[in-house]
Amino acid sequence: AFPKIIDNNNFFDDLDKYLSDHFIFRQDFREVKGFVNYNLFNISINNKVTIKDDCLFELTETNYKSLDNIVAKVDEIITRFDINDYEFIAIPLKNHYAGLDNVSEEIDEYLGVRMDNYHSLKDLLSLSDYYRTDIHLKQERLGSVVSKILELCDVEEKDIEYSFNTYDKFYGSLYAKMAISMKPDTITYLTNDLLNSIKVYSVEDKDLLDVYNVSELESLDPYSIYLNGPKAYLKIVNKNVEDRKLIIFRDSYTSSIAPL
């Protein structure tokens, strides 16, 4: 929506974002620029995104200040709420499996000596578990991750059957940044009677939501189908399990893991 005119400095920032998003043929022009840079000038990096073997990667560096903030925040939560039983699980960056950098290794090394109960999932995943045009993991490839989490939580794993629902026009966040023509990914979301019956309460919106918001598949960010995207505080109620509670401090990677 066009930004409201109010007496503060945010209007022009919002206007700039609005015009950028509503510029006619904006993505087409970006793809032409990306095509010329990549195919004519052999420039394989655009907006800190590069391509290797028909797969897009976001170039990054280890931010030790951010890691220190994570350690401090975890310590604060543990102390404030007197938590004794917790696990810290790190999902590796996709770059790790393409040998583009050592960021995941540096994160594991740094946090591994500063945090108790730190677990890396590097050995459980591979490049094929990630989308080609996005940074995230494919939900249908998360079996080993879910098994590891259940093991850490001392919960018996059960055989659960899912229906596989697919959408074959998923262009991830890295696609828009790289701005070159590529085949889309296929995004899959798993359902069964249990997941269909579960409701997700959004504290910030004060609303009951479904586990999957299928309408998001037609949005600019189809990955938001999982748990309705970047919500700050969600409560998932499973009436079949009343004697256990799991609290997750998450980022977007966990959106597709938590329902499982």
Named regions from a protein language model:
Residues 1-260:
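Extracellular glycan-modifying ectodomains
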